C-alpha cells in the first residue's frame, strides 16, 4: 500500500511551538486518546496517575542528554560549530561540523581549546580523534551546551541543562531528550511507585536524525537512522510477567516504544543490545507495547507515523486538530498524549 509522506502533514500555528518549559514539569496538559474508539479527553499531566493500575509496567528511557554542542576553529582561525553525535572512546567521536568550508580528512582542528585530527568523513559525519590531554567528556563538561532542537530558535540557557533532561536520566549518550519523560517530576515518580505500578528502564541514545524530516514521497522507502539501544534481561522478565498477569506495558515515549518493539520483533521479547533502525508506520504490528505517553510530533516526521501506526492515522490527525484548537503546546517542551 502506497503511503504518501504528505498524508502525515498538518498545519501548526507557530505560536503553539513550546520554546520554553513550564515552571513545573508535571504542570503540562495531557490529551487522552482511546485508540479503539477515537474518544478524546483533556486532562492535566498529574491525572496520569489515575489512568494506571497496580500490575501495569511503565518503561522509561534513562538516556541522558550530552552537552553535545561545542565550538572551535580551524588552525587558520575560521570558526567551527560541533554537534557530537556518538562517542566511541573518550578521545574518538563522531560529530557534525558546521563550517563555511568543510575540514579536510587528515587536517587538525580545534575543539574548544583542544586539538583534534579529522580521521574520516562519511556524508555529513566526521570522525575526530583528540590529540591533547583532555578527552571529549572533559570538553563537554567544561564547554558544552545543551543541543536544543532547531525549531526552538534560541540559544540554550542555564535552566535547560536541568529541564531538557529527565529526572531519572542516567546513561550519557543522547543528542536530544526522550521528551515524553520530561513531564515526570520526582513526586509523580514516587506516586507511581506508591500505587504499586512497576517501573523499568531501557536505554536508547537519541541521535540527531530524530529531527530529520522524511524526504521521500513514499513513506516505505524512507531509511531510518540507526541508534544504540539496550533492553536488559530483567526488563524482558518484567514484561513477560506483566503480560502473564494481565497488566499493560506502557511505554514512556517513542524511544521506549522503538526499543521494546525492536526487542520484540520476533513476537517474543528478548534482551537486545546494539543498534536499531526500526521504522514503525501504519501497517506495522506492535508486539509489546499496550499504551504510550508521547509528546506532539513534527508534521511529516517518522514519529507522527509511529503514533499513527499505533492508533490509526485518522484518529491521530483528529486528536492533533483538537489539540491545536485547544491551544496545546507542541514538540519537545510541549504537552503530552496518553494513547491507550
Swiss-Prot record:
NCBIfam families: PRK00147.1, queA. It is found in: Cytoplasm. GO terms for cellular component: cytoplasm. Pfam families: Queuosine_synth. Belongs to the QueA family. The keyword Transferase applies. This is S-adenosylmethionine:tRNA ribosyltransferase-isomerase. GO terms for biological process: queuosine biosynthetic process; tRNA wobble guanine modification. The gene is queA. GO terms for molecular function: S-adenosylmethionine:tRNA ribosyltransferase-isomerase activity.
Amino acid at each position: 500500500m502506497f503511503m504518501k509522506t504528505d498524508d502525515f502533514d498538518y498545519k501548526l500555528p507557530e505560536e503553539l511551538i513550546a520554546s520554553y518549559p513550564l515552571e513545573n514539569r508535571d504542570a503540562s496538559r495531557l490529551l487522552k486518546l482511546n485508540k479503539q474508539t477515537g474518544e478524546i479527553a483533556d486532562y492535566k499531566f498529574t491525572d496520569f496517575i489515575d489512568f494506571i493500575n497496580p500490575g501495569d509496567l511503565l518503561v522509561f528511557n534513562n538516556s541522558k542528554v550530552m552537552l553535545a554542542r561545542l565550538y572551535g576553529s580551524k588552525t587558520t582561525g575560521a570558526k567551527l560549530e560541533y554537534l557530537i553525535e556518538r562517542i566511541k572512546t573518550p578521545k574518538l567521536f563522531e560529530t557534525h561540523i558546521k563550517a563555511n568550508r568543510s575540514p579536510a580528512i587528515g587536517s587538525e582542528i580545534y575543539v574548544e581549546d583542544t586539538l583534534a585530527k579529522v580521521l574520516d568523513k562519511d556524508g555529513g559525519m566526521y570522525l575526530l580523534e583528540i590529540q591533547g590531554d583532555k578527552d571529549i567528556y572533559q570538553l563537554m563538561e567544561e564547554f558544552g551546551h545543551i543541543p536544543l532542537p532547531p525549531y526552538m530558535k534560541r540559544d540554550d540557557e542555564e535552566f535547560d541543562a536541568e529541564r531538557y533532561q529527565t529526572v531519572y536520566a542516567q546513561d550519557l549518550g543522547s543528542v536530544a531528550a526522550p521528551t515524553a519523560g520530561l513531564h515526570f517530576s520526582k513526586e509523580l515518580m514516587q506516586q507511581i511507585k506508591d500505587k504499586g505500578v512497576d517501573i523499568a528502564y531501557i536505554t536508547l541514545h537519541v541521535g540527531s536524525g530524530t529531527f530529520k524530516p522524511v524526504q521521500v514521497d513514499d513513506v516505505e522507502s524512507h531509511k531510518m537512522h540507526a541508534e544504540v539501544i539496550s533492553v536488559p534481561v530483567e526488563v524482558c522478565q518484567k514484561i513477560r510477567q506483566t503480560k502473564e498477569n494481565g497488566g499493560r506495558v506502557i511505554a514512556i515515549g517513542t524511544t521506549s516504544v522503538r526499543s521494546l518493539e525492536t526487542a520484540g520483533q520476533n513476537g517474543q521479547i528478548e534482551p537486545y543490545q546494539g543498534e536499531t533502525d526500526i521504522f514503525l508506520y501504519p501497517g506495522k504490528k506492535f508486539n509489546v507495547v499496550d499504551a504510550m505517553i508521547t509528546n506532539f510530533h513534527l508534521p511529516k516526521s517518522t514519529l507522527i507515523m509511529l503514533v499513527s501506526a499505533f492508533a490509526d492515522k485518522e484518529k491521530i490527525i483528529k486528536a492533533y486538530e483538537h489539540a491545536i484548537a485547544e491551544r496545546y503546546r507542541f514538540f519537545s517542551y510541549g504537552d503530552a498524549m496518553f494513547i491507550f
